[in-house]
């Protein structure tokens, strides 16, 4: 998930510091909000979604639902 972009920015910088000929990035999910690191965006994106808590396909919700056969968003009411 590309959320705020700190990790992706660090990986890109690491690759460039080690003289990669080119660096392209891919993310399964890009969250749409204004908290991203400046100038960070993925070159390839599977889904673009609102800023919601997601689960399924390896992402858990409170320790459960990691094996859900899809990507789902938690209702904001349930995110307390």
List the model feature ranges, each with a label:
Residues 1-80:
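PRPP-associated nucleotide enzymes
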């Amino acid at each position: 998930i590309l959320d705020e972009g700190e990790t992706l920015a660090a990986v890109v910088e690491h690759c460039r510091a080690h003289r990669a000929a080119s660096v392209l990035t891919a993310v399964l999910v890009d969250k749409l909000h204004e908290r991203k690191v400046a100038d960070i965006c993925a070159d390839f994106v599977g889904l673009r979604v609102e800023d919601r808590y997601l689960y399924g396909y390896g992402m858990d919700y409170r320790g459960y639902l990691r094996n859900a056969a899809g990507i789902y968003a938690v209702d904001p009411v349930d995110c307390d």
